[in-house]
C-alpha cells in the first residue's frame, strides 16, 4: 500500500474570543498558512492536487470557505478545494480524507487542515425569510447552536461533560487541578519557545500605523491556581462542577499541512515529518460524547498494528477537564506522555481547526527518542476521531 507522509505542518497562534483575530475571517487565517507552506517548501502551487479544510461555523463566510482560503493563499484556479464539517474532528477528518485520496491513487499532494473564527460567527433570525406577522422574535447564536449544542438532547456540550463527571465520579477539585496543570505546561512551553517551530505569525493590517503581528497563543494564562479556579461558578448546572476555568475556550485559529505520497515527496525533495499509520472513528451516546475517543483510539491502534504501550506521546484535545479525565482513566494513559505542552484548556479550541492543531503540535515533538504519536478528539453528537503517526525514517 502507498505510504502517506506529512510535511510542512504549521498553525497560526490561537486567538481568544473577541481577541486579536476578531476581524480576521477564518479563510484568511487558512490562506496565511497555505501561502507560508508554499513558500517554505518551494512547491509549485500547481502541483497540489486538492485542498481539504475543516470549518464548522461557515454561515456568512461565502461559498466553500476552503476554496476561498486556497485562492487567497495563492493557489491557481485549477486546484480544487472543499470544506469539511465533522464539528471538533473536522481538521483531522480533512487529513484522513487526504490520506484516503492518496492511498486510492486519486491524489499525490493534498493541502489539508482546519480553520475557524468563532468570534465572527453570526447571530441568526430563524423563520424570518417570509416576515413576521406580530410579536417578539429572538436571535439564535450560530456559534452556540451549530458548534456547541447537542442537537439530540438540546443542551450545551458542557452538560455532556457534567454527565461524565457524574458517571466517573470526577470531582470539581480534580477538574480544576487538571486545568491548572494544562495551563502550567503551556506557560512553560510558551516561555521556552517550544511552540515557535509550529506557529506562523499572523500580520493584521491596521487603519493607521503598522500592522499588528500576532505570534503567540492568547489564551495561555500565568498565575492560575486551583484556589482561583475554585471561586468560579458552575457554567452549565447550578450544582455542577464544569466551569469556564476547567473547560476549553472559544477561540480563533487555523492549522494546515501537506499530505503526500512518499514517492512524490522523494521526487520533489520534500523532507517528511512523519508517516500516517492509521485512523479510527467511533460513536457513542451523544449525552456522553466526551468518552468516544476511547473507541476511536482503540480502532486507530488496531489499524496501525500498534499497542498503547508503543505510543511515545499523546495529543488529546481537552474539550473539558472532566471529559479528558474520563478518557485518561478508561485508557489508563501515562500522564507524563499526554499533552506535554498543555492542551486546549490552555491553548484554546477553535473547533474546526483543533483536529489539525493537535496533530501539528504532535508532529513538532517527534524526534529520535519520541518516534510514535497518537492524537484524538471527541466530537459533538457522540463521536470521536483518532490518528497514529510515526517519525519518518
Swiss-Prot record:
Gene3D superfamilies: 3.40.47.10. Its EC number is 2.3.1.9. It is an enzyme of class 2 (transferase). PROSITE patterns: THIOLASE_1, THIOLASE_2, THIOLASE_3. The keyword Cytoplasm applies. The keyword Oxidoreductase does not apply. It comes from the Bacteria. CDD domains: thiolase (cd00751). It is found in: Cytoplasm. One of its GO terms (molecular function) is acetyl-CoA C-acetyltransferase activity. It catalyses: 2 acetyl-CoA = acetoacetyl-CoA + CoA. Pfam families: Thiolase_C, Thiolase_N. Keywords: Acyltransferase, Cytoplasm, Transferase. Coiled coil: none annotated. GO terms for cellular component: cytoplasm. The active site is at 88 (acyl-thioester intermediate), 349 (proton acceptor), 378 (proton acceptor). Its main location: cytoplasm. Belongs to the thiolase-like superfamily. Thiolase family. This is Probable acetyl-CoA acyltransferase.
